[in-house]
Regions:
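Beta-strand/loop nucleic-acid-binding surfaces
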Residues: 35-49
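Conserved catalytic cores of phosphodiester-cleaving nucleases, focusing on short active-site segments
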Residues: 17, 118-151, 164
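Short nucleic-acid-contacting surface segments enriched for D/E, G, S/T with interspersed K/R
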Residues: 45-58, 160
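Short aromatic-glycine-enriched beta-strand elements
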Residues: 24-29
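Nucleic-acid nuclease catalytic cores
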Residues: 145-155, 162-194, 216
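Domain-level recognition of nuclease-like catalytic cores that cleave nucleotide substrates
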Residues: 181-239
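Flexible glycine-rich surface loops and low-complexity tracts that mediate binding to linear polymers
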Residues: 53-64, 216-217
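A short acidic/basic microdomain associated with nuclease active sites
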Residues: 98-115
């Protein structure tokens, strides 16, 4: 279970909107007070189950004269899940808050090991740690609280898992951290229908000693907060 420490993001300058269509991976059209506006989508995943016509969305106003868009799309409302955070920067920001409160001597973001760059490298005494963070926005089984990752093929994700497996055999304490950006989901399984290679790599990593930890979150229209962490690596080995 988590401590009472609050690991959260509160977005400022937010406004409600209605989703119209996705123009490309980075841009969507929404209605704000009935007016059409092109906004930045802070997630390059498919998000097909979330970004549907007339879906309620939350936008964050960005004051940057050099930007082509004035808003970021940060969350989407889906009735059975309520609010889903789709900000791809949120998982790393939350994990950094969490790691900074775990009594490490060193927490270093964006650390290169082998041929990969991992989200975090930590030290505690003589021990060395590597953590790679993934955000989950795809719900699969609401009754059992299961989400899936990835929602689109990721060669980079497979490479990260294989590099973590190697590091684990060399004495590093390694973790793949799934930040679940929606309510009611507490476990993440590999999306074998989308990319079976990721699931195979996850099993290899687990067998090599990489810990798989799922971080549940409470999500509102303008905020996201970690509520719990569950490590059950054996569940993945036994799949």
């Amino acid at each position: 279970m988590m401590t009472r420490q609050k690991y959260a993001i509160q977005y400022e300058n937010t406004v409600p909107g209605r989703f119209v269509r996705r123009i490309n991976r980075f841009i969507a059209e929404v209605l704000i007070d009935g007016d059409a506006e092109q906004v930045h989508v802070k997630n390059t995943g498919r998000l097909q189950e979330l970004l549907v016509p007339d879906a309620r969305v939350t936008l964050q106003k960005i004051s940057d004269p050099n930007r082509k868009t004035a808003y970021d799309l940060i969350s989407v409302y889906k009735p059975e899940l309520k609010w889903v955070n789709i900000d791809s920067l949120a998982p790393n920001a939350l994990m950094k808050q969490y790691l900074m409160n775990q009594n490490y001597d060193l927490v270093k973001p964006e650390y290169t090991y082998g041929d990969s760059r991992f989200d975090f490298y930590m030290e505690r005494g003589e021990d060395k740690y590597l953590t790679e963070v993934k955000g989950c926005t795809l719900a699969a089984d609401l009754e059992r609280g299961i989400g899936l990752f990835p929602d689109a093929p990721t060669k980079r994700g497979v490479k990260h898992l294989d590099e973590l497996a190697v590091a684990a055999t060399k004495g590093y304490y390694c973790e793949i951290a799934f930040i679940i950006q929606m309510n009611g989901i507490h476990m993440v399984f590999p999306n074998d229908d989308t990319q079976p290679e990721f699931g195979q790599a996850l099993i290899r990593a687990a067998k090599a000693g990489v810990q798989i930890v799922c971080y549940s979150c409470h999500v509102e229209a303008d905020s996201i907060r970690i509520t719990d962490a569950v490590s059950d690596t054996g569940r993945y080995i036994g799949r």
